[in-house]
């Protein structure tokens, strides 16, 4: 991690022990983010946990009123409750808030931002005609430093990316089936799938404290009644955030979620129907323009394992529908933790490169 940048770029990570928090710290280091200091914060029960930052030993600190003193950025990567209770504390301390939990997006108290779309999407309807709202402008061009930003989750990034790419070909309708991994429920989800898998293979009873259902060796269209948020609520949140981000600039796809029995990797099966079959090259170019990696003709389709550690969405060769001449199918997968963390760090990078107005 670079040093010598001073407190101006001091970074605080709330929820540092979570899967998102760990990935975020890793991405900051890998991308050589100019942070003079990284402070790891979490709930009191995690205080004192030994970890490392930039190859040096570091301890996770308990989150309190003074945690954000001198911080330039405050990333919220833990629970929604932590974000709801502490984002204004961070803001009052002068930090720019970047929320990965979805809490601020749900309450409408933040600006959602996917930097990869900066030069692709037109301004939102109703935007003032100014240099700050020209195509290619970012939220940093028109928001004060004290604004809170939401870095969308992987499901929203995947849904928006596919919708924006397909929009270039003016589809009549689009549908996306999303397959979230259990790591979207943090380490508890990973542990429950691992435990259920081992116990089922040994013919032992299984724990269902996270999903309130058998997720191992199974596909779920819904969780048990005791699981909160429910899968329907997760779907509604993704649909809401996708719709609000696209904001009339791109047709919003129909969305469905199916819980997959996989640890990592967010998969999607998308269908688009056009007035006439678009040239295959144009479809591929539309996705490539958004940084999506397309499998070559001789390469196998991407899967949850093959995309581990990759920062981009990967899609297979786009296939025509066998029954609908103007229909096309897209299969894609992304490393869910990395995709979300890279987006959040890119927001901070944009703000460092182009500081917002004071």
Where are these regions (language model features)?
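Charged docking surfaces used in two-component/phosphorelay signaling
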Residues: 2, 74, 184-358
């Amino acid at each position: 991690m670079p040093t010598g940048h001073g407190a101006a770029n001091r970074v605080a990570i709330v929820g540092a022990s979570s899967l998102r928090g760990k990935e975020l710290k890793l991405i900051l280091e890998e991308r050589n983010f100019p942070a003079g200091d990284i402070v790891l914060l979490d709930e009191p029960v995690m205080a004192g946990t030994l970890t490392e930052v930039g190859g040096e030993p570091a301890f996770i600190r308990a989150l309190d009123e003074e945690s954000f003193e001198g911080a330039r950025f405050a990333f919220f990567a833990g629970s929604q409750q932590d974000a709801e209770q502490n984002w204004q504390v961070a803001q009052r301390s002068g930090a720019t808030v970047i929320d990965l939990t979805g809490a601020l997006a749900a309450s409408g108290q933040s600006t959602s931002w996917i930097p990869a779309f900066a030069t692709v999407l037109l301004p939102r309807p109703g935007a003032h005609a100014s240099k700050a709202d020209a195509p290619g402008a970012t939220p940093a061009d028109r928001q004060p430093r004290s604004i809170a930003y939401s870095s969308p989750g992987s499901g929203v990034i995947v849904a928006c990316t596919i919708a924006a790419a397909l929009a270039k070909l003016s589809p009549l309708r689009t549908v996306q089936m999303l397959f979230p991994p259990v790591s979207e429920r943090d380490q508890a989800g990973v542990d429950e799938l691992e435990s259920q898998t081992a116990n089922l293979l040994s013919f032992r009873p299984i724990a269902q404290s996270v999903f309130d259902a058998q997720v191992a060796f199974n596909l779920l269209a819904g969780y048990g009644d005791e699981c909160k948020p429910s899968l329907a609520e997760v779907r509604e949140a993704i649909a809401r955030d996708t719709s609000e981000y696209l904001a009339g600039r791109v047709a919003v796809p129909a969305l469905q979620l199916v819980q997959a029995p996989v640890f990592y990797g967010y998969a999607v099966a998308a269908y688009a129907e056009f007035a006439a079959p678009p040239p295959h090259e144009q479809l591929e170019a539309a996705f490539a323009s958004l940084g999506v990696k397309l499998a070559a003709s001789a390469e196998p389709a991407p899967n949850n394992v093959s995309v581990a550690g990759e920062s981009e969405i990967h899609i297979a060769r786009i296939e025509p529908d066998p029954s609908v001449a103007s229909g096309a199918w897209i299969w894609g997968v992304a490393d869910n933790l990395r995709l979300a963390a890279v987006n959040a760090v890119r927001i901070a990078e944009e703000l460092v490169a182009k500081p917002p107005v004071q």
